[in-house]
Swiss-Prot record:
Annotated Pfam families: ABC_tran (PF00005), cNMP_binding (PF00027)
Binding site for a nucleoside 3',5'-cyclic phosphate: 210-330
Keyword Transcription applies: no
Positions bound to ATP: 40-47
PANTHER family, per the entry: IMPORT ATP-BINDING PROTEIN, LIPOPROTEIN-RELEASING SYSTEM ATP-BINDING PROTEIN LOLD
Family: Belongs to the ABC transporter superfamily.
Keyword Transport appears in the UniProt entry: yes
Protein name: Uncharacterized ABC transporter ATP-binding protein Rv2564
Amino acid sequence: MGGLTISDLVVEYSSGGYAVRPIDGLSLDVAPGSLVILLGPSGCGKTTLLSCLGGILRPKSGSIKFDDVDITTLEGAALAKYRRDKVGIVFQAFNLVSSLTALENVMVPLRAAGVSRAAARKRAEDLLIRVNLGERMKHRPGDMSGGQQQRVAVARAIALDPQLILADEPTAHLDFIQVEEVLRLIRSLAQGDRVVVVATHDSRMLPLADRVLELMPAQVSPNQPPETVHVKAGEVLFEQSTMGDLIYVVSEGEFEIVRELADGGEELVKTAAPGDYFGEIGVLFHLPRSATVRARSDATAVGYTAQAFRERLGVTRVADLIEHRELASE
């Protein structure tokens, strides 16, 4: 088995007519038998990456090879076969059929793959026993706890013995006892030739991982001194869809704030002159930059951490930062 190899992956989509890149140039090698944690807040690209790995979303460029097959090139019957035979997905909201019992839910992918009813039933029974739900086989989702429903979802995901397991926020909405049950189960799946990729914002899962991929940069120290940046006319200070940890105040010259459009063009949002600031939303809410900023002329900007900028502005409320109050004089 060749494991998982991601090379220079770029995912781009249109949001309100603008081009958004939640993933931009990602590369990653994962050995068979590994558990990979994708860590980051909402909106950082975790679910987008899972969708690409599952063959649900096609990237703009780059490649994803699993077991030495580039899944970004698969189409039609070959893509359907990959999704059915190679991938198992555990959804955040369980996605169980409420009218079916736990046993019947696990049988669904088996029957869809052409497995006989008797063989599907035996396989589903074995899997539910494996996830410690042997006595809950006849229970419907509404009669089960969140942790139990999640274990049914895991059993269903591995019904066809896929070599790639994708889990999206598997501990969301679970109490600490249910979380423990699910964590043990997920760790047990990453054995042999199987690769397990889990998207989460839950740092409690980190000790389980063989590999952790943070889809946002580590936050800088709040005590980091201001950073003065000098740029020539036409040079880019930061690009749309990238992550950042500094809020910038213009001290000299002018900057253009532009948004890249889905058709490849761009739209001028505003021109920032001395005393103006920008980049606060991404920093405060841990979101990718929503626009590209480049120097309209030779210019200078000073970058502040969120805490330092609050002090610079003379406010404590986030709302005051977003509403662009006048800067306090130094």
